[in-house]
UniProtKB/Swiss-Prot annotation:
It holds the Pfam family TsaD. Coiled coil: none annotated. Keywords: Acyltransferase, Cytoplasm, Iron, Metal-binding, Transferase, tRNA processing. Binds 1 Fe(2+) ion per subunit. Fe cation binds at H110, H114, D298. It comes from the Bacteria. Substrate binds at L132, L133, S134, G135, G136, D165, G178, N274. It catalyses: L-threonylcarbamoyladenylate + adenosine(37) in tRNA = N(6)-L-threonylcarbamoyladenosine(37) in tRNA + AMP + H(+). It is found in: Cytoplasm. One of its GO terms (cellular component) is cytoplasm. This is tRNA N6-adenosine threonylcarbamoyltransferase. Its main location: cytoplasm.
C-alpha cells in the first residue's frame, strides 16, 4: 500500500510517499526561511507560504517516488496539534485529494508521528521509553505499541527547542536557535555560568520538565550565575546554556528508566540531532536509538508510516474532521486505555 503523507503543523511543508508503513520512496520538505528575520515562526506567514508551496511539494514527492497520484492508496495528514492556520492548509489539501481521487484519508497526531519516526529507520522491539524533543514539544513516554503510548512527563512551560530559540534571539545567535547554539558553543566554556537545573519532587510532576527558570536566568540574570572569570562571550553563554538545558532532561529520564525498568530508549524530534545531547544520553549506558536527521525534524514520512498502521487498525477518518491546534490535558489523552477513542479519528 502506498501512502501519501502530508505534514504542515508548523513552518515546514512536508510531503512523502511511503510503502507499507516503512519503505520511504520520497520525503520532500520545504523550509520557510522567511521566519529567520523574525527570530521565530509567524503563524500568518507560515500558513500563507504553505498555501503557496504545498502543491509543488506534493508533485516533487510523487516524482521522486516515481509514483502517479492515481497509484496512491491512502492519504495521511497531520490534523493536530500545531499552528491552526498551517494545519488547516495541509488538512484541506488532503481532503481535496481524498474526495477527487476517491481515496481514504487518515488523520494523524503530530506527536505520535514523531514517536513513530525512529521505527522507520531501526527495528526496535517494544516496549521502550521515548524522549521527544522539538521546538513545540518536550516529553517522556512509555510505548508498548505504535498506538499504545503513555505520556509520563512533559514540559510545564517552554519546550526544549523553544527555550533554545528564545535565548538565541536575545543574544542574536540566529534562528533556529538549536543548531546555532550547538555550533557557537563549540568554542565556549560550558562552566562559565552555572545556570539552574529544575527537578521536581512531587509525585505528580516526577517526570516533568521546566525551562522557564533556565531561560530567565540566561536572559535576565546572567551575571548572577557567573562562576568563572571567563569573559561574557556568546560562545560561553551558549555552551553554559546548552549544558544546563540538557542536564534538565537527565534526572526525569533516569527516573522513568528506573521506575519502568525499561532499558531501551528512543530519541525523537529535531533537538535529537544535537551531538552534545547524544554524548549526554550515551553516558546513561542503555540501548539508545536515534533516527537520521531527516526523520528527526518534521517530515511527511513519519505521518505516512504511522498512517498506514493506523488505517489498518482503525480505518479511515471522517472527511468532516477538523484541525485541532491544542490537546487539552494531553498527559491523560495519550494513555493506552483511551487509544481507540483518541487515535482512531486523531
Amino acid at each position: 500500500m502506498k501512502v501519501l503523507g502530508i505534514e504542515t503543523s508548523c513552518d515546514d511543508c512536508c510531503v512523502a510517499v511511503v510503502e507499507n508503513g516503512i519503505h520511504i520512496l520520497s520525503n520532500i520538505k520545504l523550509n520557510q526561511t522567511e521566519h529567520k528575520k523574525y527570530y521565530g515562526i509567524v503563524p500568518e506567514i507560515a500558513s500563507r507560504l504553505h498555501t503557496e508551496a504545498i502543491m509543488s511539494v506534493c508533485i516533487k514527492a510523487l516524482k521522486k517516488a516515481n509514483t502517479k497520484i492515481s497509484e496512491i492508496d491512502l492519504i495521511a495528514v497531520t490534523s493536530r496539534p500545531g499552528l491552526i492556520g498551517s494545519l488547516i492548509v495541509g488538512l484541506n489539501f488532503a481532503k481535496g485529494l481524498a474526495i477527487s481521487l476517491k481515496k481514504p484519508i487518515i488523520c494523524i497526531d503530530h506527536i505520535l508521528g514523531h514517536l513513530y519516526a525512529p521505527l522507520m529507520h531501526s527495528k526496535i522491539e517494544y516496549p521502550f521509553i521515548s524522549l521527544l524533543l522539538s521546538g513545540g514539544h518536550t516529553l517522556i513516554a512509555k510505548q508498548k505499541n505504535f498506538d499504545d503510548v503513555e505520556i509520563l512527563g512533559r514540559t510545564l512551560d517552554d519546550a526544549c527547542g523553544e527555550a533554545f530559540d528564545k535565548v538565541a534571539k536575545h543574544y542574536d545567535m540566529g534562528f533556529p536557535g538549536g543548531p546555532n547554539i550547538e555550533q557557537i558553543s563549540k568554542n565556549g566554556d560550558e562552566n562559565t555560568f552555572q545556570f539552574p537545573v529544575t527537578t521536581f519532587k512531587k509525585k505528580e510532576n516526577w517526570y516533568d520538565f521546566s525551562y522557564s527558570g533556565l531561560k530567565t536566568a540566561c536572559i535576565h540574570q546572567l551575571e548572577k550565575f557567573k562562576s568563572k572569570d571567563n569573559p561574557t562571550t556568546k560562545n560561553n553563554i551558549a555552551a553554559s546554556f546548552q549544558k544546563a538545558a540538557f542536564e534538565n532532561l537527565i534526572t526525569p529520564l533516569k527516573r522513568a528508566i528506573k521506575d519502568t525498568q525499561i532499558n531501551k530508549l528512543v530519541i525523537a524530534g529535531g533537538v535529537a540531532s544535537n551531538l552534545y545531547l547524544r554524548e549526554k544520553i550515551d553516558k546513561l549506558k542503555i540501548q539508545t536509538y536515534y533516527p537520521p536527521l531527516d526523520l528527526c525534524t518534521d517530515n511527511g514520512a513519519m505521518i505516512a508510516g504511522l498512517g498506514f498502521n493506523m488505517y489498518l487498525k482503525y480505518g479511515e477518518s471522517p472527511i468532516e474532521i477538523d484541525a485541532n491546534s491544542r490537546i487539552e490535558n494531553y498527559k491523560n489523552q495519550y494513555r493506552g486505555k483511551n487509544n481507540e477513542k483518541n487515535f482512531s479519528n486523531a
